[in-house]
Amino acid sequence: MQLSHLLLAFAMIFVMTIMYAPQVQADAWADANADADVNCEVTPYHPDCRGVMP
């Protein structure tokens, strides 16, 4: 009986991991995109900064 409870616990952990993983990946992509924004004060000659800085 203990083995079936252990298998049930692992199955629940596995299912919860599968359900939670896409949200973690989406958050990671959002953070990476926010970090990738060009800082025109640091790199004023970057092509994305044309017309932003004098």
UniProtKB/Swiss-Prot annotation:
Residues 1-26 form the signal peptide. GO terms for molecular function: toxin activity. Keywords: Disulfide bond, Secreted, Signal, Toxin. It is found in: Secreted. It comes from the Eukaryota. GO terms for cellular component: extracellular region. Contains 1 disulfide bond. Expressed by the venom gland. Belongs to the formicidae venom precursor-01 superfamily. This is U-myrmicitoxin(01)-Tb5a. It comes from Tetramorium bicarinatum. The lineage of its organism: Eukaryota, Metazoa, Ecdysozoa, Arthropoda, Hexapoda.
